[in-house]
């Protein structure tokens, strides 16, 4: 069996699963569900870029995969802090002179 057909089928499956995660982001019901769905969409986007890189036969898209992973991690960390504290950046005015 041709590997290109398998790659295209894998791309379609990951794209369809991304649509399911998009529905979870829109519907919710809670903020935690939306955060987990966005994180899963980041991982699925990394998989799509990796499969597309294999399909094209190039290794130069690996930097994009790393950047997507870093941004997904930072986004999840920021949302977790927002859910915990209610704000992302805390200002402590007592330390200023």
UniProtKB/Swiss-Prot annotation:
Q: Name one GO cellular component term.
A: plasma membrane
Per the record, the domain of life is: Bacteria
Sorted UniProt keywords: Antiport, Cell membrane, Hydrogen ion transport, Ion transport, Membrane, Sodium, Sodium transport, Transmembrane, Transmembrane helix, Transport
Report the locations given in the UniProt record: Cell membrane
Q: Does the keyword Nucleotide-binding apply?
A: no
Main localization, broad class: membrane
A GO MF label = sodium:proton antiporter activity
Give coiled-coil spans as residue ranges: none
Where would you find the membrane-spanning parts of this chain? 3-23, 35-55, 60-80
Q: Which InterPro entries match?
A: MrpF/PhaF-like
Q: Does the record bear DNA repair in its keywords?
A: no
Q: How does it sit in the membrane?
A: Multi-pass membrane protein
Functional description taken from the UniProt entry: Mnh complex is a Na(+)/H(+) antiporter involved in Na(+) excretion.
Family under the similarity heading: Belongs to the CPA3 antiporters (TC 2.A.63) subunit F family.
State the oligomer form and interacting partners.
May form a heterooligomeric complex that consists of seven subunits: mnhA1, mnhB1, mnhC1, mnhD1, mnhE1, mnhF1 and mnhG1.
What protein is this chain from? Na(+)/H(+) antiporter subunit F1
What gene is this protein translated from? mnhF1
